[in-house]
Amino acid sequence: MKPGEEIAVSNGVDGKEYRCGIEEFLDGEVRCTLRFIKEDGVELPSHIYLFQGLPKADKMELIVQKCVELGVFEIIPVATKRAVVKLDEKKARSKTERWQGIAEAAAKQSKRGIIPQVTMPVSFAEAVKRASSMDLSLIPYEMAEDGMSLTRELIESARPGMDIAVFIGPEGGFEQEEINLALENDIRPIT
């Protein structure tokens, strides 16, 4: 890089891309001048919150990476009844820090305007409580009765600016008790 070249800068929070011209290099720093702000970056028009059932082994790392690359706004690991993985407080904190690092790297790699947050794991009940306040909450469930027509209708109802919760279960799926709790809180089952 040299003076006169243009660089793209992001604060990782507001989704904007700041285009700057390099002015000079001083004592390990780069002085730039803001040229313009690109408001319509690569972020999705809605915020997608992934409530991910804890998977076996290190599969969560790949899930975090790919979901960040695809545009997910926040990832909430969820301890479900059928989850094989059981994390104590210390392990949960360590894993969350690792997952957050993966989210940051994936956001930079895919030139995201924000760095999605990976929260500490929560119980299924806590996840349902949080998701129930969102504009649209969906839970894929193999026994959903309304089929693909309702699934299409719900997905097509998503609008810019909405907060959308998507639940994904662990390898064994969700217990009927968990599905019932989701239904009681207006989380819609889809196929």
Please place each PLM-identified region on the residue numbering.
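Generic structural signal for residues in well-ordered beta-strands
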Residues: 32, 115-119, 189
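Active-site/ligand-binding-proximal alpha/beta "capping" segment
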Residues: 134-173, 177-180, 185-191
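Short acidic/polar active-site loop segments enriched in Thr and Asp
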Residues: 2, 73, 188
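N-terminal positively charged helical leader segments and presequences
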Residues: 1-39
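RNA substrate-binding interface of SAM-dependent RNA methyltransferases
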Residues: 39-139
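Mobile, glycine- and charge-enriched loop segments
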Residues: 7, 33, 42-51, 155-162
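Gly/Ser/Thr-rich beta-alpha loop segments that engage phosphate groups in nucleotides
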Residues: 6, 55, 171-175
